[in-house]
Amino acid sequence: LVDTAGKLISYFNSPYYTKTISVEHVEQDPNDWFKLILKGLTEFKNKNPSCQLSALSMCSQVNTHVFLDERGEALLPAIFWQDTRAKVEANEIDSKISNEQKISWWGTPMPIDASHVISRMLWVKKNKPDVWAKTKYVMLPKDYCIFKLSGEVVSDPLSNIGLVDNNLKYIDDLLSLVSGAPAKLPPLKKMTEQVGVIKKELPFNGTKIINGTMDAWIGILGSGGFENKKNIYLSGTSEILGINSKEVMPTPGIIIFPEDENIKLHAGPTQ
């Protein structure tokens, strides 16, 4: 919780459980994310009863996916970014895409791996057809939490790295490789855009919700990555080197984010 001058007023943090079922299967309970957001908001309100919250924004891990039914209930535990169950499907899809296509989409020959949403969609379609048939949306953690807070279905382009092109749009030719995939993805809006308000029955009801984006991009931005050609090193669950530059040199292992807010981030490695 920060004031309008950027001063830290209060903060909340809490661990939550990651279930490692096997080397390939790693999951989280998406309800844990939302319960802790509500706990944090309640704590902020109790500690700062006179506080008028102007806005709330979301940031989360990416390459973690929740399959939701038409009521917005999770059909499976969230498939965590470390989960590799879809490696066969990833290889199948990757073999259908040329390096020339990848460079035209992303500026670099980025492979489709087991953490890519298109790989996981194909895995669910093959291995859990009943779940696939019931799936209305496939969401990232921050988008799931925005949905639970506001009822709005939305995502942002940067959180969907590998699924959007340099124009910040979903790649039709990629999505067409898994029948039914395009209809199960949330619409995209800018990360700075208001996408809803907190529901009336929740703490700080009526507060504007700003879309936000992924953890690595926000972390590098907060470390000074908005400055042109400034090198950034971010250490945490992933070790990330990044630089903001308009120059593009396709390099295996380097992710080039689509330009957004006049920032074109090059980063790697990310896992």
Predicted regions, residues:
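Short, intrinsically disordered, charge-balanced linker/junction segments flanking boundaries
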Residues: 3, 195-202, 265-271
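N-terminal glycine/serine-rich phosphate-binding loop of ATP-dependent small-molecule kinases
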Residues: 1-76, 134, 203-211, 249
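Glycine-rich beta-strand-to-loop/alpha-helix junction loops that act as flexible
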Residues: 56-62, 191-193, 235-237
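Short glycine/serine/threonine-rich phosphate/pyrophosphate-binding segments
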Residues: 60-61, 118, 217-220
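Acidic-glycine-rich active-site phosphate/pyrophosphate-binding loop
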Residues: 10-13, 189-202, 243-255
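Glycine-rich phosphate-binding loop of actin/hexokinase-like ATP-binding domains
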Residues: 65-70, 74-93, 135, 139-170, ...
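Gly/Ser/Thr-rich active-site cleft segment
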Residues: 103-216
